[in-house]
Amino acid sequence: MGKYFGTDGVRGEANLELTPELAFKLGRFGGYVLSQHETEAPKVFVGRDTRISGEMLESALVAGLLSVGIHVYKLGVLATPAVAYLVETEGASAGVMIXASHNPALDNGIKFFGGDGFKLDDEKEAEIEALLDAEEDTLPXPSAEGLGILVDYPEGLRKYEGYLVSTGTPLDGMKVALDTANGAASTSARQIFADLGAQLTVIGETPDGLNINLNVGSTHPEALQEVVKESGSAIGLAFDGDSDRLIAVDENGDIVDGDKIMYIIGKYLSEKGQLAQNTIVTTVMSNLGFHKALNREGINKAVTAVGDRYVVEEMRKSGYNLGGEQSGHVILMDYNTTGDGQLSAVQLTKIMKETGKSLSELAAEVTIYPQKLVNIRVENVMKEKAMEVPAIKAIIEKMEEEMAGNGRILVRPSGTEPLLRVMAEAPTTEEVDYYVDTITDVVRAEIGID
């Protein structure tokens, strides 16, 4: 990743790290890079989530885009995947989303989509970063007739809602509980599921700029679990702040995570002959129980590094149409170019309706193994070399031998911090504790700085 761009755009604490000045430059330089080969006046869609800093950053970003002659279509508050969908289907030059996913309200981010609806590749990000770091801004500064035009485009949200409804099936009064995380889905999820005919209970639908993801949403599903049980709902659907993730809750109040959601959708598509190459793309963090369930069904898997960016890269490279992460990013490439929590939710309820099975029945086919993750502080220079340390290598091999195939160990460096992550999965919590504690003791003794 670069100096400004991380794995999911530019992020930081709003007004301190991600300032209006930086947002203006990102609009100006990013817009220029993404539209310099356009033969007609370029058009860029801009959306945001509900953070209090969103309008401030949007104003600065839009000014930057307009300053290089780009026509800006302001979408207002809507889901990140809605921007990707609209860019691809309406022939825009690019899209920009101002959001910070599941992060707290003080953070914000700016994420670009190319004209194909996909997140920017490393080369385009490097071009933008080079302009940001240049000593002088040498980009054109057009006079009045060359400036961009600003257009409010609320109908973009309605088009996205209509599209998601078109991919579903009538729910005929199914009781559905929604948690929109006081975020981007608060403008659309209720409408989508009402149009599908669901009987709704909704929480996390009163954003005030500061309460996005605050004890609600996909990272805090506890409130939704209670609401599902109290309302007698058949399913609960929790989105994150920008609605690119989904965590579900079954009728008993139990969590159905991204691994289980991918399995349910993957099995459904496989049985219909619609799962490309009969393969699901997942990351190294997916649970062993998920892998065992896929093996039992004869479904193949491709495994990538952690991050939906890497999942999408593998899907595009190899022609797969389903992938995702345990955290709830699910990419359905036949429908959209990026993870889409509300799309995943529509597909999940469709599968329940078509199969006549409850969510707990569908999810029961995946037995999630207990998992434990411990972070150990190490010198940055050592985190990449940990697996070369003889004692560490030996203890991992010893633990894997003891597991005899009925468990999994993953030791990997953090991509952003001076940490070595030690993760284990096994049939019981006692076994998991034993494996992780044994390995971490050796790692700390050899290279730890705690």
Curated annotation (Swiss-Prot):
Binding site for Mg(2+): S101, D240, D242, D244
Gene3D superfamilies the record matches: Alpha-D-Glucose-1,6-Bisphosphate, subunit A, domain 3, Alpha-D-phosphohexomutase, C-terminal domain
Post-translational modification: Activated by phosphorylation.
The keyword Hydrolase is assigned to this record: no
Active-site positions on this chain: S101 (phosphoserine intermediate)
Family: Belongs to the phosphohexose mutase family.
Gene Ontology molecular function: magnesium ion binding; phosphoglucosamine mutase activity; phosphomannomutase activity
Catalytic activities: alpha-D-glucosamine 1-phosphate = D-glucosamine 6-phosphate
Identification of the protein by name: Phosphoglucosamine mutase
Keywords assigned by UniProt, alphabetized: Isomerase, Magnesium, Metal-binding, Phosphoprotein
Co-factor: note: Binds 1 Mg(2+) ion per subunit.
Entries under InterPro entries matching the protein: A-D-PHexomutase_a/b/a-I (IPR005844), A-D-PHexomutase_a/b/a-I/II/III (IPR016055), A-D-PHexomutase_a/b/a-II (IPR005845), A-D-PHexomutase_a/b/a-III (IPR005846), A-D-PHexomutase_C (IPR005843), A-D-PHexomutase_C_sf (IPR036900), Alpha-D-phosphohexomutase_SF (IPR005841), GlmM_bact (IPR006352)
GO biological process, one term: carbohydrate metabolic process
Protein's job: Catalyzes the conversion of glucosamine-6-phosphate to glucosamine-1-phosphate.
EC number: 5.4.2.10
Cofactor: Mg(2+)
Origin superkingdom: Bacteria
Main EC class the enzyme belongs to: isomerase
Name of the gene this protein is made from: glmM
GO cellular component terms, semicolon-separated: cytosol
Phosphoserine sites (modified residues): S101
